[in-house]
Amino acid sequence: DARESVFVVGNIGTAYTSKSLEMREDSVTVAEISSFQLETIEQFRPKVSAILNITEDHLNRHHTMEEYIRVKELITKNQGPEDVCVLNYEDEVLRKFGENIVPKVVYFSSLRKLDQGIYLDGDQIILKTEKEEIPIVKTGELKILGRHNHENVMAAAAMAYYAGVSVESIHKSVCEFVAVPHRIEYVTEKNGVAYYNDSKGTNPDAAIKGIQAMNRPTLLIGGG
């Protein structure tokens, strides 16, 4: 809603190159970049980047957590001081990483108020800049469940704000956003039982976050 020409590409299933010929000089690209892709970047320089968390994953390729972390942090490799990196304050690895990088760091937290950054205060998500406190949205207005999704909203809102999107557009977008397929995706309700598809929860951390998002007794139906 905030821009005429926006492309959502990358590790979500739409190759960046498949849309490159459609892009204009004023186009905005929202890209999910995998650790596999970050291994070989040379000139890639996002105006706004983010790392949401560091959890054990892809060790069949990276072999150690130290190497996996090193590769994930390459997203800021070419960023300058006028660029922005959004990081999870509650992730100790990312909090320390943010102390020693070139771009402006904006932290998010669902557990505490921050002197600067975006955080959850009661049921209100607030962005605090050097100059003001900006209410973004109340969690009750969101259509997605769970504290981890509140954190996702914080990260997305911060990225959009520092990319020049208005607070009004951010509020409208996060209120309208529904769960992406296979991630705590509402299916139906039968006989008072709500069914959710969370089949993308393929590592322990993702599965735990899905369970924590439920506010009623929960039964898991899993494949083998």
Language model features with spans:
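P-loop NTPase switch/communication element
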Residues: 4, 13-26
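Nucleotide phosphate-binding/pyrophosphate-handling subdomain across enzymes
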Residues: 139-224
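Short acidic loop-to-helix transition motifs that present clustered carboxylates
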Residues: 12-16, 35-37, 92, 179
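Short active-site oxyanion
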Residues: 5-6, 26-27, 80-85, 192-195, ...
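Flexible active-site lid/hinge loop adjacent to a nucleotide/diphosphate
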Residues: 22-114, 119-121, 126, 133, ...
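Cofactor-binding loop segments of dinucleotide-utilizing enzymes, especially the Rossmann-like FAD-
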Residues: 11, 110, 223-224
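Walker A (P-loop) phosphate-binding motif
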Residues: 1-9
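Short glycine/serine/threonine-rich phosphate/pyrophosphate-binding segments
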Residues: 14-17, 33, 203-207
